């Protein structure tokens, strides 16, 4: 059984831009999840200087090292199963039946968190270039023995 807590940084849709605000916010994380549309593999190297990284590819990650990332990833952190995919609409499994605690996605550029049947569906929004009126954001998951606490942080508040 896992004792204590784990702080996980969650980002998506960097599209080749890794802001200084992102690097500062992720300091102290024990693991970083990138939910696709990385845009430049050097971003993952810079994130790995902070903590271990689990990343998947998004619809813009077609070439080079980013194109070799998996489409989905199932990872266990702090005794909980987390499933990463870029577009939540493409989810083709039953997270409850699979014992998944958190489904992490990106793609929409809109941060969202929703609990359904005991599963957290978490989208940190986009940490890359601002698109239309969407915020520039990232997320955190704090996992304890008894809870999963999600949080989204707006990096460039108006």
Where are these regions (language model features)?
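Conserved beta-sheet core of the metallophosphoesterase superfamily
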Residues: 54, 81-83, 88-147, 151
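Short, flexible, glycine/charge-rich loop motifs used to bind or transfer phosphoryl groups or to couple energy/partner
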Residues: 19-24, 43-46, 72-73, 90-94, ...
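Short, solvent-exposed aromatic-acidic interface loops
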Residues: 150-158
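Active-site metal-binding loops of divalent metal-dependent hydrolases
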Residues: 12-16, 37-38, 59-61, 87-89, ...
């Amino acid at each position: 059984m896992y004792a204590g807590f784990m702080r996980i940084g969650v980002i998506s849709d960097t599209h080749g831009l890794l802001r200084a605000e992102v690097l500062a916010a992720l300091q102290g994380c024990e693991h970083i999840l990138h939910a696709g549309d990385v845009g430049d593999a050097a971003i993952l190297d810079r994130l790995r200087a902070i903590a271990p990284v689990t990343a998947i590819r998004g619809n813009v990650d077609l070439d080079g090292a980013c194109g070799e990332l998996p489409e989905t990833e199932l990872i266990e952190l702090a005794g909980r199963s987390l499933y990463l995919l870029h577009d939540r609409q493409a989810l083709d499994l039953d997270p409850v039946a699979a014992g998944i605690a958190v489904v992490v996605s990106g793609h929409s550029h809109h941060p969202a968190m929703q609990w359904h049947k005991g599963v957290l569906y978490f989208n940190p929004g986009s940490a890359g270039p601002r698109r239309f009126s969407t915020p520039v954001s990232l997320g955190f998951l704090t996992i304890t023995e008894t809870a999963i606490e999600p949080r989204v942080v707006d990096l460039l508040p108006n």
